[in-house]
Amino acid sequence: MKVYLAAPMRGDRSALANVKKLLQALEERGYVVLTKHVADDVLDVEKGMTPREVFERDIRLLEEADVLVAEVSYPSLGVGFEIAYFLLRGKPVIALALRERLESVSAMIRGITWENFRLVAYSDVDEAIEKLDSMLPGSVDMQ
């Protein structure tokens, strides 16, 4: 199964350590993570990619992915776009937010009631991974 892991890239990257652990956990479980670059310390634009190249690459990867896992504890226009794009294609989205930041997550994201969307609060990354294990497609909770 192919996972699109989404996380803030240009804004507040306070959850980066959690994103790195999520990436590692997904790969250890045999998932193909298409967006390993979200855990990089150096941004794509700093590596010389243009915004258009980033957009085109990410759209291609969104089309290829089976499920989107998004870290939404900190605001990101890009992550919001990726969630909407995926939802409108009827694909499953799991959004993860630190419990202490849940009220800061966009009301637009917190208000989604579609069947293919889950917003999951977590206290630490181990709890997030445990919840992901039970929610990824193929498990009872996402069907």
Curated annotation (Swiss-Prot):
Q: Which domain of life is it from?
A: Archaea
Coiled coil residues, start to end: none
Which catalytic reaction applies to this protein? a pyrimidine 2'-deoxyribonucleoside 5'-phosphate + H2O = a pyrimidine nucleobase + 2-deoxy-D-ribose 5-phosphate; a purine 2'-deoxyribonucleoside 5'-phosphate + H2O = a purine nucleobase + 2-deoxy-D-ribose 5-phosphate
State whether keyword Ligase applies. Answer: no
| Keyword Hydrolase tagged | yes
Query: So what EC number does this one have?
Result: 3.2.2.-
Q: Which GO terms describe its biological process?
A: deoxyribonucleoside monophosphate catabolic process; nucleoside metabolic process; nucleotide metabolic process
The positions annotated for binding substrate are H37, E82, S106, A107, M108
Give one Pfam family, short name only: Nuc_deoxyrib_tr
Q: Which PANTHER family match?
A: 2'-DEOXYNUCLEOSIDE 5'-PHOSPHATE N-HYDROLASE 1
Q: What does this protein do?
A: Catalyzes the cleavage of the N-glycosidic bond of deoxyribonucleoside 5'-monophosphates to yield deoxyribose 5-phosphate and a purine or pyrimidine base.
Q: Cite the record's note on assembly.
A: Monomer and homodimer.
* Assigned protein family: Belongs to the 2'-deoxynucleoside 5'-phosphate N-hydrolase 1 family.
What is the designated name of this protein?
Putative 2'-deoxynucleoside 5'-phosphate N-hydrolase 1
Q: What is the lineage of its organism?
A: Archaea, Thermoproteota, Thermoprotei, Thermofilales, Thermofilaceae
